[in-house]
UniProtKB/Swiss-Prot annotation:
Subcellular location: Membrane
Tissue expression from the record: Almost exclusively expressed in the brain.
Annotated protein name in UniProt: Sodium-dependent neutral amino acid transporter B(0)AT2
Gene that produces this protein: SLC6A15
Gene Ontology molecular function terms on file: amino acid transmembrane transporter activity; branched-chain amino acid:sodium symporter activity; neurotransmitter transmembrane transporter activity; neutral L-amino acid:sodium symporter activity; proline:sodium symporter activity
Role noted for this protein: Functions as a sodium-dependent neutral amino acid transporter. Exhibits preference for the branched-chain amino acids, particularly leucine, valine and isoleucine and methionine. Can also transport low-affinity substrates such as alanine, phenylalanine, glutamine and pipecolic acid. Mediates the saturable, pH-sensitive and electrogenic cotransport of proline and sodium ions with a stoichiometry of 1:1. May have a role as transporter for neurotransmitter precursors into neurons. In contrast to other members of the neurotransmitter transporter family, does not appear to be chloride-dependent.
UniProt feature, compositional bias: Acidic residues: 43-59
Cellular component aspect of the GO annotation: membrane; plasma membrane
Reported pH dependence: Optimum pH is 7.5-8.5. Strongly inhibited at acidic PH.
Length: 730
């Protein structure tokens, strides 16, 4: 190199001697600087602005105020309405206490590893679901778009359930509760009980007729239900206001929305234990039926529940974790949140069956009283001989044990005539075996139980306020799974995007507040999420393990966590989880194919539910929900594979860091190029290859040398490579 070259002069003046290769070999200095810089997302051009080290600069990408706030957000997202009204039903249906064993096994094999995977990629790359999968491979960017579509489909109908809860909450401030008794109908001559209510029950009538004013089929829209329209609007306004500033606004609400449901559940459990029959309900719940546990259907339903309970594939988990510090222990978070979710489900199951045990006891006492009166009538009429009734039994004040004794005697003596007597066995187990889930549990069975509580309005207010908070916690994560990826990718303002999303969702959601809206909720719940989310998570697993590389990913985790994660995760991610997810997908497709597509319609004349098949247009909608949700995956792959559009979303130009200002050199993630850093302090930018540090130090000195202008940039590197180039060109 000529002595008078500008590069030599720089070396003499500024003690700069590193070549491009030397610069790329620096490691220690970059590692030190890693801890002093913070990630922001910025789509603007780089600014030649000096920022003093240690100066207070507000990050453009928000961060959690505390670890507790983050954990509560993840818990609020994963613990939702399904924990209260689906897990108890599955537990009862699939062997009682024995169901907990397959659930725990699948939680360890599928749940925690995949939850840990989503947390770690979000925290490492610090983007939403679209950016994360673009980063790993631009051809797989459709995975993130598919997550957003599924999130939006789910948000459309999930917020309707919050609207229903708001309606019941608003109606709970009266004594007696409006669903306590059947309404009376008056005409010119006399007063009588509403026939539809008399044939069903007061709570069933109130749900279908007063709340939903439901039509007889999905084809009869019946117009909008104005009461539910107002409640849906209120629900979306609440979500919009809570999410308009992202985690900066929702983070403050999370403390209440995540913790309040636990307060209510514990209060309900204590209150239920003081009521007659609660122990019967819990005993019935946890009596194991081991023979059922070996059925394949039990394991399929347990795997599906684990999958959806943790919110896998929605993108909310990735979005929340993207606001974490890079060195956060996401493995601890995955295990903690997973087991909190499990114990919440068990707690909710205890509460549900303690309350249903009390309800069954009340109904059983009424049954015994009514049937005892019927037996006394038969005794007076001579249909039954007084001699067969034991002398120590008084049918006027009969106990359950004595009634069952009399019932068995009459059944044996009057064997041929017994069916004509229309006597009921009045066994509490039969009442508890009437499995209910979903809206049937929350808005019919549980509301009926609360009418028998002392101070029933108070408990009703608490219960439906709990449902609102459970729903909002899940909605925050769902909306975050939509907004964060789009903001990161397209650089739109979060406030504007949030308002547009909520406004559009309310307008589309009007189909759910028609008189036939409940049938559309069932349709979306059955078809919009199950298959698409399974496909999304399978592709996530493949992307990390086989496209990016499981070995490099394990190195990244070691770099982030400060310790090597157990090899257990290596084998789960690479072998076990993909096989189990594929098996679950096949089983779900087979089950969906064997189950006739339809819904339970409320028939007013019969005052009962009746299964109806979807009309042709309904089948088209069902198929469209699945296709539209998963369509972004092949579309993005084809577009990127054949370069059909000029797209730079595979670059890292959108990721910048303050404190040392400013990283801005696009890098193709599919190539081996290394990004270039501009600034006085090397930044904490994720490298295109997770397992490699961008800088490597040659001499081991504590600081990384810079050019005279304080930059690492194109000009400085080119000066070292091409010394004869004019300085103005550098």
């Amino acid at each position: 190199m000529p002595k008078n070259s500008k590069v030599v002069k720089r070396e003499l003046d500024d003690d700069v001697t590193e070549s491009v290769k030397d610069l790329l070999s620096n490691e220690d200095a970059a590692d030190d600087a890693f801890k002093t810089s913070e990630l922001i997302v910025d789509g603007q051009e780089e600014k030649d602005t000096d920022v003093e080290e240690g100066s207070e600069v507000e990050d453009e990408r928000p961060a959690w105020n505390s670890k507790l706030q983050y954990i509560l957000a993840q818990v609020g997202f994963s613990v939702g309405l399904g924990n209260v009204w689906r897990f108890p039903y599955l537990c009862q249906k699939n062997g009682g206490g024995a169901y907990l064993l397959p659930y725990l096994i699948l939680l360890m094999v599928i749940g925690i590893p995949l939850f840990f995977l989503e947390l770690s990629v979000g925290q490492r790359i610090r983007r939403g679901s679209i950016g994360v999968w673009n980063y790993i491979s631009p051809k797989l960017g459709g995975i993130g778009f598919a997550s957003c579509v599924v999130c939006y489909f789910v948000a459309l109908y999930y917020n309707v359930i919050i609207g229903w809860s708001l309606f019941y909450f608003s109606q709970s401030f009266q004594q007696p509760l409006p669903w306590d008794q059947c309404p009376l109908v008056k005409n010119a001559s006399h007063t009588f009980v509403e026939p539809e209510c008399e044939q069903s029950s007061a709570t069933t009538y109130y749900w279908y007729r007063e709340a939903l004013n439901i039509s007889s089929s999905i084809s009869e829209s019946g117009g909008l239900n104005w009461k539910m329209t107002i409640c849906l609007l209120a629900a979306w306004v609440m979500v919009c206001l809570a999410m308009i500033k992202g985690i900066q606004s929702s983070g403050k609400i999370i403390y209440f929305s995540s913790l309040f449901p636990y307060v209510v559940l514990i209060c309900f459990l204590i209150r239920a234990f003081l009521l007659n029959g609660s122990i019967d309900g819990i005993r019935h719940m946890f009596t194991p039926k081991l023979e059922i546990m070996l059925e394949p259907k039990v394991w399929r339903e347990a795997a599906t529940q684990v999958f959806f309970a943790l919110g896998l594939g929605f993108g909310g988990v990735i979005a929340f974790s993207s606001y974490n510090k890079r060195d956060n222990n996401c493995h601890f978070d995955a295990v903690l949140v997973s087991f909190i979710n499990f114990f919440t489900s068990v707690l909710a199951t205890l509460v549900v069956f303690a309350v249903l045990g009390f309800k069954a006891n009340v109904i059983n006492e009424k049954c015994i009283t009514q049937n005892s009166e019927t037996i006394m009538k038969f005794l007076k009429m001579g249909n039954i001989s007084q001699d067969i009734i034991p002398h120590h039994i008084n049918l006027s004040t009969v106990t359950a044990e004595d009634y069952h004794l009399v019932y068995d005697i009459i059944q044996k003596v009057k064997e041929e005539e017994f069916p004509a007597l229309h006597l009921n066995s009045c066994k509490i187990e039969e009442e508890l075996n009437k499995a209910v889930q979903g809206t049937g549990l929350a808005f019919i069975a549980f509301t009926e139980a609360m009418t028998h509580f002392p101070a029933s309005p108070f408990w009703s207010v608490m219960f439906f306020l709990m449902l609102v908070n459970l729903g909002l916690g899940s909605m925050f994560g769902t909306i975050e799974g939509i907004v964060t990826p789009i903001v990161d990718t397209f650089k739109v303002r979060k406030e504007i995007l949030t308002v547009i999303c909520c406004l559009l969702a309310f307008c589309i959601g009007l189909i759910f507040v028609q008189r036939s809206g409940n049938y559309f909720v069932t349709m979306f719940d059955d078809y919009s999420a199950t298959l698409p989310l399974l496909i999304v998570v399978i592709l996530e697993n493949i992307a990390v393990c086989f496209v990016y590389g499981i070995d490099k990913f394990m190195e990244d985790l070691k770099d982030m966590l400060g310790f090597a994660p157990s090899r257990y995760y290596y084998y789960m991610w690479k072998y076990i989880s993909p096989l189990m997810l594929l098996s679950l997908l096949i089983a779900s497709v087979v089950n969906m194919g064997l189950s006739p597509p339809g819904y339970n319609a409320w028939i007013e004349d019969k005052a009962s539910e009746e299964f109806l098949s979807y009309p042709t247009w309904g089948l088209v909608v069902c198929v469209s929900l699945v296709v539209f949700a998963i369509l972004p995956v092949p579309v993005v792959f084809i577009v990127r594979r054949f370069n059909l559009i000029d797209d730079s979303s595979g670059n890292l130009a959108s990721v910048t860091y303050k404190r040392g200002r400013v990283l801005k050199e696009p890098v193709n993630l599919e190539g081996d190029d290394t990004s270039l850093i501009h600034g006085k302090i090397p930044s904490e930018m994720p490298s295109p290859n997770f397992g490699k540090n961008i800088y490597r130090k040659q001499s081991g000195s504590p600081t990384l040398d810079t050019a005279p202008n304080g930059r690492y940039g194109i000009g400085y590197l080119m000066a070292d490579i091409m010394p004869d180039m004019p300085e103005s060109d550098l």
